[in-house]
A protein has these predicted regions:
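Short acidic-hydrophobic catalytic motif
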Residues: 169-173
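Short, charged/small-residue-rich alpha-helical element at the C-terminal edge
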Residues: 180-254
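Residues that scaffold the ATP/ADP-binding catalytic core of kinase and kinase-like folds
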Residues: 23, 174, 249, 253
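ABC transporter nucleotide-binding domains
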Residues: 1-157
Length: 255
């Protein structure tokens, strides 16, 4: 909807002061879009794909090369290779180059790192940081909370509705409850037992820990949870009070 491809059922939105319904033609001239699924022409070469998208916006590779050189420079040695023969990371760089070739004011990225290896993902976010420094506004849709935390502002959404908008730091700071991480030798059994622990408002697996959410209005001491778990024959129990992450905040908003 923000890229003016779909009409909204309700509400309104603007891109750079332009209405997404009334000014859709103007918006399409100032935005770049990289879909989640690789959708360039697989039978065209790297260079041919880039030339095609440049021609759509009446520009050339040479005219905007300075903007894409850090990204395109990494795949330029393979410019005669067909896009369908590129690796996942190289396809990603080509798609981003094509989205930038007309020097957009706003760049939309739809889950750009899904299915990409960790090294390429890290490189990609470093590229985005450099693009931001060049004055391009970047809007990223991502299912990865650690990636969301790299953004200046985030909107947590569920079923098309915005639950909260703020900086990552403020969203974590606004977490309204006490949060503890709990670890024992048997995490699945721990999670099952904690689901029946009445003092806990919520509990869920989080890596090698289980996060336990406690309402601040309830009297709670970690020692009481330790005793409760020992009575259930758990050993090597570790309980720590922690600050909330973006993912903790999102889970709480969903509940």
């Amino acid at each position: 909807m923000l890229t003016t491809v779909l009409l909204p059922d309700s509400g309104n939105a603007e891109i750079d002061g332009l209405d997404v319904i009334n000014d859709y033609k103007k918006i399409r001239q100032i935005l770049g879009y990289m879909p989640g699924k690789f959708s360039l022409y697989q039978d065209l070469t790297v260079e041919e794909n880039l030339e095609f998208f440049a021609s759509v916006f009446n520009t050339t590779i040479a005219e905007n090369y300075d903007l894409i050189k850090d990204i395109y420079g990494q795949i330029e040695p393979f410019k005669t290779r067909r896009a369908g023969k590129l690796s996942g990371g190289m396809k990603q760089k080509l798609a981003l180059s094509c989205a930038l070739i007309h020097k957009p004011k706003v760049l939309f990225l739809d889950e750009p790192t899904t299915g990409v290896d960790p090294v390429s993902r890290k490189e990609f976010w470093e590229m985005l940081k450099r693009l931001k420094e060049q004055g391009i506004t970047i809007v990223v849709a991502t299912p990865y909370m650690e990636e969301a935390s790299l953004c200046d502002r985030i909107a947590l959404m569920q079923n098309g509705k915005i639950l909260k908008i703020d900086t990552p730091k403020q969203i974590c700071k606004d977490f309204p409850k006490d949060l503890f991480e709990v670890k024992t030798e048997n995490i699945p059994a721990l999670l099952k037992i904690l689901k029946g622990y009445k003092v806990a408002e919520n509990s869920y697996a989080f890596g090698e820990f289980v996060h336990v959410v406690i309402n601040k209005n309830k009297e709670f001491l970690p020692e009481t949870l330790d005793i409760f778990l020992r009575e259930k024959n758990f050993e090597n129990i570790e309980i720590n009070k922690i600050g909330a992450t973006i993912e903790d905040s999102f889970i709480d908003l969903l509940n």
